[in-house]
Amino acid sequence: MYQTSPLSLFYFQVLVPKFLECFLCFPYHKISLVALLSFFYCQLQTNMIILLSQIKRFLYRQIMIALKIKAKKFWFIFKYFNVSCDARLFNELFYIFQTYVSVDSK
């Protein structure tokens, strides 16, 4: 269940009724206006959900970039101290980092 933002509540509780009060004097417009408002409200909710998923994907990409940089620094530390670490072990470590982040981001 997604919560609405205070701005959307203000928009639908204050601005829309003031804007549409001239149309509400006609009784045959009431049903269509309620349907139209509910459609726009659902569209707003959908757009908010899409925006949240885009933000989540962006943050996931940024975390993955940071992990790649840290993993490369980790690899250089192994090289600097002459620790035997082959590419397969490095890939396994990076896979562990990647799966840890992907589980936490969902």
UniProtKB/Swiss-Prot annotation:
It is found in: Membrane. Residues 28-32, 95-106 are extracellular. Residues 1-6, 54-73 are cytoplasmic. Disulfide bonds: none annotated. The keyword Transmembrane applies. The keyword Metal-binding does not apply. Its main location: membrane. It comes from the Eukaryota. Keywords: Membrane, Transmembrane, Transmembrane helix. The chain crosses the membrane at residues 7-27, 33-53, 74-94. It is a multi-pass membrane protein. One of its GO terms (cellular component) is membrane. This is Putative uncharacterized membrane protein YAR047C. It comes from Saccharomyces cerevisiae (strain ATCC 204508 / S288c). The lineage of its organism: Eukaryota, Fungi, Dikarya, Ascomycota, Saccharomycotina.
